[in-house]
Design a protein with these regions (language model features):
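Conserved nucleotide-cofactor-binding alpha/beta core module
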Residues: 157-158
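A polyampholytic, Gly/Pro-enriched intrinsically disordered region
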Residues: 167-174, 235-240
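Active-site pocket-lining/capping segments in soluble small-molecule metabolic enzymes
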Residues: 15-154, 180-313, 317-375
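Short, Lys/Arg-enriched N-terminal segments with co-localized hydrophobic residues
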Residues: 6-18
């Protein structure tokens, strides 16, 4: 790690070691207190007023989580007021999400008014995916804190330069960014702030520095969010949940050589010339819980910290509350192990021994890093 990164990301201004913070998904206000006690540093949650749902339905989503049948988001200003009181009591901030990739023209003033109401009761930070909405808010002189959503797709140095003109507080890297990509962007931003001479220290207060967030646990998706056109609602299954088999297609191979929806691996015909892989299923606990079963980046925490990541996203709005609480506790435990480890190898060995004694899911967020570390 270069000197700029070390000075900028590993130490607070008082010399104390800087730790990556846990940003956890919140499905309802009932979860807030439990998740605070579990170890979350901050939260993100959706807010879709009932008035919006009645007017636009599910086909024009506000945050791409238009689900009503279980707890995924908050649906009234009254609930937000209760949550605001809890935030004031515990001091753990909540960021509201507006993750739709675009809106129609008439919706921008409506969203701006919605954000003003939320700001009046104490919510100052917003996760936004639509660049036009960010620009609109700034042109309306709405001075809220903006986090660039992980649904915004490609993140590179040129993109960050443009968005910094709109006074971003945080960049959330999307699921397909490699650790090398993240480090390149972060180093670029740091050198802009302190100059090209290594060893200089960023003397700005922490509150004014650009933060960087990466996915750490749950909901690894095969698609890139910015190019996903699936509706996430009660009326139909998510496109990313449709079963499929990823395999090589060979010239002349017949249609019936492929797996069909509904078949299991055990009853399909083997693909000619290939052996059916055997999959070892790791042991879950007695409640059916396994950390990171839908996506895990715990092995990469050492590299993420080296790259300059300041916050770790723990996805899980709508998950079982008990499982989310365990996820937060396990991510906190992994960070404690990281703090006590001198090398990456020490960290991974200790973390796997404690959190995955019977094996992990193998569903890696940062697979390139994982395979490189295994060589």
């Amino acid at each position: 790690m270069d000197k700029i990164g070390k000075d900028r990301n590993d130490k607070y201004d008082n010399g104390e070691e800087m730790q990556m913070k846990i940003t956890a998904g919140l499905g309802s206000i009932d979860e807030y207190e439990r998740f605070v006690h579990a170890g979350a540093d901050e939260f993100f949650c959706g807010y879709v007023p009932n008035e919006w749902t009645k007017k636009y339905g599910t086909v024009m989503p506000l945050n791409r989580r238009e689900v009503l049948s279980y707890n995924v988001q908050i649906g009234s200003l009254g609930e937000l007021e209760i949550l605001a009181a809890m935030v004031k009591e515990y001091g753990k901030p909540v960021h509201l999400t507006f993750n739709a990739l675009y809106y129609i023209p008439e919706q921008y003033p409506e969203i701006a008014e919605m954000i003003k109401k939320c700001m009046r009761i104490g919510f100052d930070s917003y996760i936004i995916a639509d660049p036009a909405l960010i620009l609109y808010l700034r042109k309306q002189h709405i001075d809220c804190e903006i986090h660039l959503s992980g649904e915004t797709a490609e993140v590179n140095t040129g993109m960050v330069d443009i968005f910094q003109q709109m006074k971003l507080k945080r960049v959330i890297f999307h699921r397909k960014n490699t650790i090398e990509d993240m480090k390149s962007v972060i180093t670029h931003v740091q050198r802009q702030n302190v100059g090209d001479t290594e060893g200089k220290r960023d003397v700005r207060p922490l509150q004014s520095r650009l933060e960087f967030e990466a996915f750490a646990l749950n909901e690894l998706c095969q698609f890139t969010g910015a190019f996903c056109n699936s509706l996430h609602c009660d009326e139909m299954g998510y496109l990313c949940r449709v079963p499929y088999l990823l395999t090589c297609i060979k010239n002349g191979q017949q249609r019936n050589d492929y797996i069909t929806c509904g078949k299991t691996t055990s009853d399909r015909d083997d693909i000619p010339g290939q052996e059916t892989p055997s999959i070892e299923i790791p042991a879950e606990d007695d409640t059916g819980y396994l950390p990171g079963v839908s996506g895990c980046g715990l092995c990469a925490l050492y590299r993420l910290k080296e790259a300059g990541i300041t916050h770790l996203k723990l996805v899980g709005r709508g998950n079982y509350t008990d499982f989310m609480e365990k996820d937060i506790r396990n991510l906190r435990r992994a960070l404690d192990i990281l703090k006590a480890s001198k090398t990456e190898k020490d960290y991974i060995n200790s973390m796997k021994k404690i959190l995955f004694p019977y094996g992990c899911s193998g569903n890696c967020y940062y697979r390139q890093h994982y395979y490189r570390s295994k060589k």
